[in-house]
Amino acid sequence: MPPHCQPHCVLLLLSTFLSLGLGLEFTGSEGQWARYLRWDASTRSDLSFQFKTAISDALVLYFDDGGYCDFLLLSIEDAKLKLRFSVDCAETTITSDKMVNDSHWHFATISRHNLRTVLALDGDSKVDEVRPQRQFMKIVSDLYLGGVPQDIRTSALTLPAAKEMPPFKGIITDLGYGNKVPTRLGSQKVRLEMEGFCTENPCENGGSCSMADGEAYCDCSKTGYTGRYCNEAVNKTPGFAHMVKSPQAREENVATFRGSEYFCYDLSQNPIQSSSDEITLSFKTWQRNGLILHTGKSADYVNLALKDGAVSLVINLGSGAFEAIVEPVNGKFNDNAWHDIKVTRNLRQHSGIGHAMVNKLHCLVTISVDGILTTTGYTQEDYTMLGSDDFFYVGGSPSTADLPGSPVSNNFMGCLKEVVYKNNDIRLELSRLARIADPKMKLQGDIVFKCENVPTLDPISFETAESFLGLPKWNTKRVGSISFDFRTSEPNGLILFTQGKPQDKKDSRSQRSNKVDFFAVELLDGHLYLLLDMGSGTIKVKATQNKVNDGVWHHVDIQRDGRSGIISVNSRRTPFTASGENEILDLEGNLYLGGLPDNRADLILPTELWTAMLNYGYVGCIRDLFIDGRSKDIRQIAEAQNVGGIKSSCSKVTAKQCDSNSCKNNGICKEGWNRFICDCTGTGYWDRTCEREASILSYDGSMYMKVVMPTIIHTEAEDVSLRFMSQRAFGLLMAATSRESADTLRLELDSGRVKLIVNLGKGPETLYAGQKVNDNDWHSVRVTRRGKNIKLMVDDDVAEGQMNGDHTRLEFSNVETGILTERRFASTAPSNFIGHLQGLKFNGLLYIDMCKNGDIEFCELNARFGMRSIVADPVTFKTKGSYLGLATLQAYSTMHLFFQFKTTSGDGFILFNSGDGNDFIAVELVKGYIHYVFNLGNGPSLLKGNSDSPLNDNQWHNVVITRDASNTHTLKVDAKSVSQVVNGAKNLDLKGDLFVAGLGPNMYQNLPKLVVPREGFQGCLASMDLNGRLPDLINDALFRSGQIERGCEGPSTTCQEDSCANMGVCIQQWENFTCDCSMTSYSGTQCNDPGATYIFGKGGGLIMYTWPNNERPSTRTDRLAVGFSTTIKDGILVRIDSAPRLGDYIMLHIEEGKVCVTFNIGTVDISVKEMTTEVNDGKYHVVRFTRNGGNATLQVDNWPINEHFPSGNSDIERFQMANKKIPFKYTRPVEDWLHEKDRQLTIFNTQATISIGGNDRKRPYQGQLSGLYYNGLKVLNMAAEGHTNIKINGSVRLVGDVPTSRSPSRTTTSMPPEMSTTFIETTTTLSTTTTRKQRSPPTIQTTDDIVSSAECSSDDEDLEECDGGHTGGELVIPVLVEDPIDIPPISTRVPFIPLPPTLHPVLTIIETTKESLSIATEAGVPCFSDQGRDDCDDDDGDDDDGDGLVISGFGSGEVFDSSLPPTDDEDFYTTFSLVTDKILTTSTYEGGYKALAPKWEEKDFKPKKPSEVGRITAIPPLPDLRSSAASPVRPEPAPKIPAGKMNNREVKPQPDIVLLPLPTSFDMDGTKPKGPYITQPMLRTIPSALPTVPGIRRVPPGASEVIRESSSTTGMVVGIVSAAALCILILLYAMYKYRNRDEGSYQVDETRNYISNSAQNNGTVVKDKQPSTKGASNKRPKDKDKEYYV
């Protein structure tokens, strides 16, 4: 007898039937209820019961927390169960799908699990959860069934509506709290269901049950048995006689099976031999699969099972199996209802074609379920006898998967009743024999002989890829089985994995020698795979043809016997056979379900298991896990292990998860299983929603990061992704390398492309992707390898390939970045990387972030975290005579050069290498701009960097020079690049040494054409990359000369006297300084850019800022500053008011032309006034006001400070001052309050509004306001940005763009120079043009603009009147008259705001029309570079811009195209490309160039209509063309301005220039003339300029006196004629130069002198010799440099 059938002592306690809980019958009467002891559902607990009813609406169950928040209500609404509950006032509802008003029994369960609650009805579960602050439910009341007592106060109910709900009508039974029966405390209008004792009949052998006096009695009269329960036989006969019963004695015996129980009847003593037989039984279960009954072995057996909710029958009588499947019409048989099965087999005569005998005997097999569903068939051939001498298994077996013909591998779970086998000779009542413990019946497990509820094996959901369960060891050696159901929509995931002990531990560092047995099931790309290794090699079996990640349940059944086995997925069977001869699967470790733990030190993962290598955990549902036929309650295991990310239910959310746009920072959202999956590759972020910024590593060529693996890793699949930023064309990004082999997976930069090298030991495979990725921008790289297939993606560029050979395994022990350290097996080593790396992810592991956070210990690192400025191996050349030599530059076919430099010198050689013939390459610095000169045999060519400003600003700059296979040369300086395609020769033949930073003796005299510098480079060079070679400038030098040192300290950046302009305050910081410009009205890093500027027109305007009610400040001190320009005598500039009825205010206004501030802080009006000088002179002034309590100061520009101090200091004097304004009845309360609070009337209370413009006070201001600052608020900036708290009304117009006001307390950040509005007027020096061939045409604005003074001088009709009543007029071009006045050679840019049109004659805007331009062009006006080609053609055949006058200025704030690229020409810093020897010093604000002209008064003629504001050119007089004169202003260059903020050039002094209101020179000596005295020819109808005050005035530093003089008509005509004649001469000269130019190269003026920049930066360590200021100012310009201004 097998050991599994050893006898077990089973005691049947008949009293068990009497312990059944009584059912309750609810009649539906008003006031009915049943009350049970409180159910503790606060955190985790289950409640279950059975019920049946016929009504559609009723209260079933209720409890709460006594009237506060928490409650649980189960009711029937619309014939469906509805669960409504609340935790901490967070409420939700669950409704079942099934109707329950069918008078059938239903089983309901309520499961509480912290915030999650599950409602299960007949096996179908619905789940929901709430998210309150409290994590548990409070329960105070008892549990009420069927209704709520009416005497309970409504206020004591959390849900008072429960009292009004219809009462329940029906029966509720088997109420249980978990495994316990609750105590019933009382009931009303509810009766016990007395028949409940007989529901499970305790009478055996067909006895009938009846109730009397509350007890059950059995009627045994018709059974042939006696005893209380009809269990005592009257007589017994040998053999099977005691089992044969009369037809009337219908036995009804039941047993409960839970997956591990079964019983078997031993047939060895009485074998079965029958030709006809019958099997009957009843079953009730929730389970989908399970063995019901089996007898026989080998090829002679009967198997009855439940398979996927259907009944399966397999009969084999020796020659082949007869199989039948019975399925219900609707639903499944696993519905926890009783179903009856009957199987019969009878001998029948069967005739058919092909049979030798016509009437041959066959067995007719019939199976029926519930007496309705019937399937009939015949067994094969003539085997008619069933012979069995084995066992009769009921409910299961020791190894169900090994039973012959078994379609399932797990045992039955549920109830089996009246299992009977009978044939012609015997009747085996198997259920009864088990219950009475017949000696031949052997029981396995704890079998209960009554039908108990066996809950279904609840599914669990793995919600994250990191969640997993650890199950006990799978004890399988030779045979075993595993079955489960899974459901997911995700394509990848590890479902099962377990392994054995290592067979060999000779080398713990290598996986190769640690061979272990393992078993795994994985989902890969939607297909299911079985992996098995029994010691002789791994097999990988694909078990599906179609993808199974479709979101529906799939059943998997795996059965193994020795080396062979079958995996079945949804009944599709796939056989497999393990390698080798071994038949033992030796497993020792845990069986992991859903994934693997983070700590895998004890795991030896097979390379063939790709999901483990790639860290793909399973996300989805698992249910019905059976191991060797025994169920595993994985829900209970999950709760016991308390694993995060696992939920004890399974439901699919119908809504798309990506609809919520949950992936931040441009992450790509993908649909997962009840989750969204964010692909953060290429975003620079990581984490679940791409919200966590990935760490950045900065590499300077000597830095690296190396992750050393604890063991040698072998993989067949890799996922690698990273981001990088670099200006280098070569360098190692990452490499997986091995210490033991040549295996590698390497990503590197190669000639500006990304190169992937994969070597698996049989030679490298190479892929390229991306183009010109060395652009100092972020690029994302992704590598995917699956076996032999590899894919490389760089941004949107994709390259795919396939590995050659049979090798698919990659061996590596390191992951390296920056520098390749494992070079033993590398044939060539890549260049070291210089740049930034971010987001390196290798097979799911973020190595950079793990290294930073200390999550891995085996990380070698010297690269620096953070986005750091990379300066690699800097070297300082301390003198212009210092230089060194390197080996010849290898750049024959292509070239990629990179270096960084930092200098204060404007000129010098950087690189030079000569070659064969005329070939050479030179990189030089000319006037602060990079020049790249080369000759490939076609003649010299030049590329000039187009930087915004000179580069000798003591800042690091990056230079990239490339030449590709198409002979396209590119020069990139910082972020700006220029390119040129050169035809002809493509190879660069270089020989000799590469000179760095200078040339050797006597080499400057023999330089090629277009090479300019005649001296060496003085400054710092770093990060030199010569076509992938990273030289050490010191150690690799072939020779050196002069003072050369490592490192680069550079000039200091400490605060100097002139660090901040316009009285800005210099703030010293650790490595730099910043300027506080808050009280200057200026902005920018040096306080020399204008602030936000508004023009208030004659109609009056108002800008109103209102504080939010809850943010109104009260201050003891105030600071106010604003710049303005006006001619009015009275008006309010700014007024700050307190809340209504308080009366506090501060008002800045003009009275009688003088600035005054009046304020009141609760006493009397206090005024501070500038009494000496009027400010309504049309000039730009800055007024500063400060208050501290009652003390106040007022200062205009840098004039003397006006101060005010209170006359009284005591509280009484202050109160007496305030008493004059306090009503009599409030005097005493106020006095008491003042004494109590010790408040001395120094607080400006509850400030509510800031009013600008005075229009609300009937004292409108007219003019310009700029850079208003008040207590940290830049109100005008805020207005320009459209702040929500600011309202603008009336005639108010914004001028141009403004700096941001987002950081009102900091004014140290300025816009780029091209966005500055500092330059007001522009000056143009008329000179010849030297053009250079083969340059790209400049991108310029092509509007057709010309001066037309006969129209309105502004486009704002609200600001001025325009009357065209006057006719006539003439175009005036004032001729500049040289004046020998001593003028300082340095001036600064001046902020300007156009003045209102109603003032006295001051500078204003000249406008143009397209028509006027056409007239001018036809009249032969010189062409300007900002005109289009259609209207501007100099007919010289080249694409230069001509040599016309360019007159430009600043005007009305009209928005123009700002995309005009500035040139890098030595003397020309505007958008007119490659034009030399011109000076156009201007603001490129918004790309618009505007000019200024006098404003006509009423007595003069006025234009008729407005036109567009445009650019201005000078033309000869035209008939009937009305005109006006423009007063030019030339800003003076600034002395010693910190790096990069101004054009640091020496500008020749030009006399007769009008300087607008406030210059920004900071020469503190006010006795020196601050600029030239100006004469300006005007129209005779315009009066003289405003007179100036005699004597020496207190003027701002650097200010210029403006003197306007009337000119006669004769002088004006002379000027016009002179200008016209000069223009014609210039045009002829330009045509001559063009016709005689050198066709093979650019024209070069060899006689030009390149003067070093004299405006050095603050604190430079090495400075050029400064030219004499005095000499420069006294020298008269030559006649050929006459200048014309409009």
Swiss-Prot record:
Region of interest (Disordered), residue spans: 1324-1348, 1501-1545, 1653-1686
Q: Name the major location.
A: membrane
**Disulfide partners:** 198-209, 203-218, 220-230, 415-451, 621-650, 658-669, 663-678, 680-690, 1020-1048, 1055-1066, 1060-1075, 1077-1087
Residues on Extracellular side: 24-1610
Subcellular localization is given as: Membrane
Q: Where does Ca(2+) bind?
A: 300, 317, 380
Its BP terms in the Gene Ontology are:
angiogenesis; cell adhesion
In which residue ranges is the amino acid composition biased (Polar residues)?
1336-1346
Q: Is Ligase tagged as a keyword? A: no
> Which ranges carry the Laminin G-like domain?
24-198, 254-451, 458-650, 696-859, 876-1048, 1092-1292
A molecular function (GO) held by this record is: metal ion binding
Which cellular components does GO assign to this protein? membrane
The EGF-like domain extends over 194-231, 654-691, 1051-1088
Per its UniProt entry, which superkingdom is the organism in? Eukaryota
* Membrane topology, Cytoplasmic segments: 1632-1686
Parts of the chain that traverse the membrane:
1611-1631
Listed name of the protein: Neurexin-3b
Q: Which organism is it from?
A: Danio rerio
